[in-house]
Each structure stands twice: as C-alpha cells, then as structure tokens.
Amino acid sequence: MSNIHDHKILILDFGSQYTQLIARRIREIGVYCELWAWDVSEAQIREFAPNGIILAGGPESVTADNSPRAPEYVFNAGVPVLGICYGMQTMSEQLGGKVIQGVGEGEFGYAQIELQTTSALFKSIEDAVSAEGKPLLDVWMSHGDKVSAIPDGFVTVAKTATCPFAAMANEEKGFYGVQFHPEVTHTRQGQRMLEHFALDICGCKANWKPSSIIEDAIERLKKQIGDDEVILGLSGGVDSSVVAMLLHRAIGDKLTCVFVDNGLLRLNEAEQVLEMFGDHFGLNIVHVDAENRFLDAMAGEAEPEAKRKIIGRVFVEIFDEESKKCANAKWLAQGTIYPDVIESAGSATGKAHVIKSHHNVGGLPADMKMGLVEPLRELFKDEVRKIGLELGLPYNMLYRHPFPGPGLGVRVLGEVKKEYCDLLRSADAIFIEELHKADLYNKVSQAFTVFLPVRSVGVMGDGRKYDWVVSLRAVETIDFMTAHWAHLPYDFLGRVSNRIINEVDGISRVVYDISGKPPATIEWE
C-alpha cells in the first residue's frame, strides 16, 4: 500500500478567508496537505518534510511594521514555493523585490491577466487570446497592495492593465507568485494551475483518494486500538456515521454505538438510524429512548442558549451512564474533522491559526478515563462524505442539509413541548418531501421549518380555528457565513402551505422567511 502521507504540501496561513479552500483544492487533486500558522519553526517544517509549500493570502499589508512573514527557511528548503496574493507579496519583499501600498487602485473581483512568457505553472492554459496573440486568463483578484519590483532571478509571467506583476516566476528554483486567487471557482483555470504546481512542479503523486484514505484509516485504527473495545456516540449525522463505519470495518463487534433519541429528531429519524446501522450494517447499537428526560429537563425554559446547554448536559449525563455499562471500553471515538482542529487563536501577533491538542466535540466529562479515537481529524467535510459513499452509506443521508446539534430544540421557538415537536416534525417532513418532488432540494443549501409559539385565526370549512403558525426557511449559500433567502416558486410555496394546513391538525398558518444572513442568522435560535 502506498503511504498516502508520503507526498504532501504545506500551506502557511496568513489569515485569508480562502485559506481552507486552498487546502480543499489540493486534496481534490489527490495530494495530502496541512494548514499551519505562518510563524511555524524551521524544525517543524523539516519534520513535516513537504514536497512543496504554498504561502496563502491574508488581510495584512507587507508594507506595515511587524506584518507576518514567511519563515526564511521556506526559501532555503529546496522545495518549490507558490505565493498567492499576500503570499506573493511577502515572497517578493523577502527575496529583494518591492511592494507598494495600494492607494485607491486595488483590484477586487473579476480581472483578466495577459501571459507575457511561458511558465510551468501556466502550461497549456488559456481562456482567450489577445489581439497580439498572447494568452488571456479570467481570474479573481482581491488586493490593495501590489508588487512594484520583482526579485532578482524572477521574470514577469502575467500582468493586468493596473497590475504590472500579476504573476512572477523563478523557474530554476521553482518559486512562483500569483496576485490572484487560483483556489476560487471564479478563476476559471485555477484548479489546473494548482494541479501543475502540486503534481508537475512539486512531483507529488495523487495518492490521496477515498479508497486509500479508508485503507490507511483502518490500518491506523487497528494499530491504535489493538484488541480493546471502543464506544461511540452515534447521532445519525454525517461525521459520527462515517466514524461508525470505519471502526466497524477495523474492529467489528468491539465497537459499541450509543444512539440517544432525545425526542428532538426529524420524522422517523430514530427508526431510520436503527434500521440502517443495526439491521442493515450489523453494528452493535445501544438505543436509549430519552425523549421524556430531555423534555422534562427543558420544561419552562424559553431562552435559546439555556436550551442548548440543557440538551448538551443531559446528553453528557446519559452518555456517561451508558459508557459505565461498557466496562471494557478503553477508547472513546469522536467525529472531529479537520476544520474543528484548526482554531483561530493568538500566536505572538494574534494573526495566525493554531492547532488544538484535540477538539472535545461532545464536551464529555473530563474524568472519563478513556483514550480518544478521532479517525476523521485530517479530513474536510466534503472528504468525509466521499469516504462515506465509498463505505456504502447512502447518498441521501450523506448529502442531507445540515441539522443543528440540539435538533428541534432550537427550531421550536420558546419552550419546547412534545406537542410542538410533533407538529413541527410533520410540517417539516412535508416541506422536505415537496422540495425533493420538485427537484429543488439540492438547489438550496438548507431548508427547514420553524415552529412559532403564536396562535393565529384560520377558517376550515364553516368553522373557525385558532391554531399554531410555522415558518418555512430556505437559503442559498456557499460557506454558511453569509446566505441569501431562496427564491422558491410561488406555486411551490402555495402547494407546501396547503398541504401543511390540510394535513397537520394544529397548524393554521404558514409563512416564508425572506431574511438574508446578515442581518439574520440561518437558524432562528
């Protein structure tokens, strides 16, 4: 088996919002990479032994005092280096070039660069050709400062009307700088540039693929766990489901999954989880029906944060009780993924990301004397989904819209009662079913129903009814940091509303939430 970590790229983070996207793009090429703070030590780089280094973008100005710099060793490590945006500017400045502060003439958004010479980074890439016969590329810019003089040994590879050095290269050393962002989809050929860098220039092999990741994870789990037993909190969500399947492959019936039904799940969700993992895949599952315990604990509480804390506390209590029954379990498995491990924090400047020692996702008791098993901690969410498919989990489950940890506890506004949860479950199921029927489910990023603790007058037949109100919510987003409300067709919304009011006894009115994020959040609570 080829070692999937043998060929790898190191990405140094200077604080750009796109840095994780660079890592995901490199992984998509099939090459392993890690994301580290810009102020990493020479010893750490030597130990990691990357085949190439990428200097990512960032919000700082190279011209400012004490702005972040790449470690000098980066340029003496004998491996290719690619500087992106701020990364190009600091490369240029550190190697003897010049950077000037932008004064009202930065480039933000779409731009077209004109290639001036051939380069390994841009081999056989063009979107159009200029009148003079030079290749043109559509790219995405986001910079104020710019390079005004390139270092000795470099050549100008590309320019724009306002940026004389949109790309530079020292082919002999394998140093490249681009002022634009190849990692965003607006740069049409960006992925091909990153492929050229990782595969051709750095010489990496594309070993990082789902089947190899699974093989490697199983081998490492067997080595870590040996003949011990493992306990896992299985929620039915993507991360815990994939962890369950990996562990089942690695250690079989030495895995015990604890599934806690808190009464705050979607319609028939508990039955689906038990059927899929218990009956179909044959995992050892302990089913805890704790609906009354959760609802009793939340009785009378209307404040969202307090509800979240109660739900978290009761889950921990139950999991602790169940883990004590598994006396032989030496390991606790968690669905920690790579973005959980990368945490914005204070290095010397407060401008870097640091790596946590571990991320205790469930907030489990500190006195649980178990080792931690986190087989997904190197993976991004999209990678977790891909290996889930490879492990045989259904597409519809892996690519379902996000569901909050506290479940319906934060989709029932105010106090949570069984009656409200039951009404909400039924209404939400109709909304989701109709989205699938209309082929709209995968065209929105997230859709759900919210129960409002207000009654509204309605008319059914000749009678007057005074029942509850629900709101439909659907959004479109790329990163969930900002979102637009989804412009669903009126006839579709009318159909959903009619079905809910006619089929769910207790709901008299349906409204549609047309708030964007910001100012509103995606979830109501």
UniProtKB/Swiss-Prot annotation:
Keywords carried by this UniProt record: ATP-binding, Glutamine amidotransferase, GMP biosynthesis, Ligase, Nucleotide-binding, Purine biosynthesis
- All copies of the GMPS ATP-PPase domain together span 208-400
Describe the location of the Glutamine amidotransferase type-1 domain by residue ranges: 8-207
Q: How does it assemble?
A: Homodimer.
CDD domains for this protein? GATase1_GMP_Synthase, GMP_synthase_C
Q: Which organism is it from?
A: Shewanella frigidimarina (strain NCIMB 400)
* One protein family per Pfam: GMP_synt_C
Q: What is this protein called?
A: GMP synthase [glutamine-hydrolyzing]
Chain residues that bind ATP: S235, G236, G237, V238, D239, S240, S241
Report a single Gene Ontology molecular function. Answer: ATP binding
- Quote the InterPro entries the UniProt record gives: Class_I_gatase-like (IPR029062), GATASE (IPR017926), GMP_synth_C (IPR001674), GMP_synth_GATase (IPR004739), GMP_synthase (IPR022955), GMPS_ATP_PPase_dom (IPR025777), NAD/GMP_synthase (IPR022310), Rossmann-like_a/b/a_fold (IPR014729)
What GO CC terms are in its UniProt record? Answer: cytosol
* Annotated TM spans: none
Biological role stated in the UniProt entry:
Catalyzes the synthesis of GMP from XMP.
Task: Indicate yes or no for the key word Cytoplasm.
Answer: no
Q: Does the keyword Lipid biosynthesis apply?
A: no
Q: In which pathway does it act?
A: Purine metabolism; GMP biosynthesis; GMP from XMP (L-Gln route): step 1/1
